[in-house]
Amino acid sequence: MGRRALDGPSVILEHSLTFFTIVNNLRLKLDRAAISLEDLAAKGPMKPEELRGFKDYDEYVKNEDITTINGLKKMPPRVGVREVPEETHYRTGWLLSEEMTKMMLDEAMKAKLLIHKSKVDQKVCLTKQMMMDEFDIIRGLIMMAYPAYYGLGEWEPIKVILENREEFDEKMDLTDDLPADKSSVWVCGKELQAEKFFYDYFGKNEKSKYVVKVQKRGSGAPQREPMIDE
C-alpha cells in the first residue's frame, strides 16, 4: 500500500489501520470502476453470461423469448446509436454517441490518474473523500448515459460496483482488498500491534517521518521502501 504520515505518535494504531485499509480498498474499487467504465464506453453493455463468447448470438436467441435466455437472465434492451465489432464477444458493441463515449472515456482516465502511484512522488495525499467524489461523478455520468441503468443488465460490472454488489471468494484470495481485522501495520520491518500507540515503538518525536505499509496478516514482512525525502 502507499505511504502516509501518521497523525502523530499519540494516535492509536487501530485507528490508523482502519484509515489505511479504507483508502486502499477504495483505491482498488475505483480502479475497477474506471476499467469497467472504459469497457462500457468502448465496447458497449456486457451480454448475459449465457451469451458471452457467441459471435452470432442473434441466431441463438431468435427462437427464444427476447427478454429471457432459457428462462434465466434478461437481455438488456438495445441502447445506442452505433455498433462496433467486439472481438471477445463478451459485450454487445452497441455504443452511445461519440460525445457521450468521449465523456465516459475521459472520466475513466481522470479516475485512473487520481489513484495513480505517481501521486506519491508528487506528494499528493489520496483521501477517502477525493475518491468518493469521483464515484459520485461516475455515477452521475452513468445515469446520464443510461438513465436508471436502462440498457444495462444486472451483471454489468460498473452497475455492480456502484451498487456495492461485488463478491470475492476469500479462499481464492484474488483481490488485494485489505480487511482491517485481518491486516497489520508495518514500519521499518516491524509489525505493529493494533491496540498500541505509535509512541510505544518509536517515541514521541513529532517531527519523525516513517514509511508505513499495510498488508494481510501472515504474509510476512513487506518489501522495504526507500527513505522519504524532506
Question: Where in this protein do the model-derived segments appear?
Answer:
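Ubiquitin system architectures
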Residues: 1-230
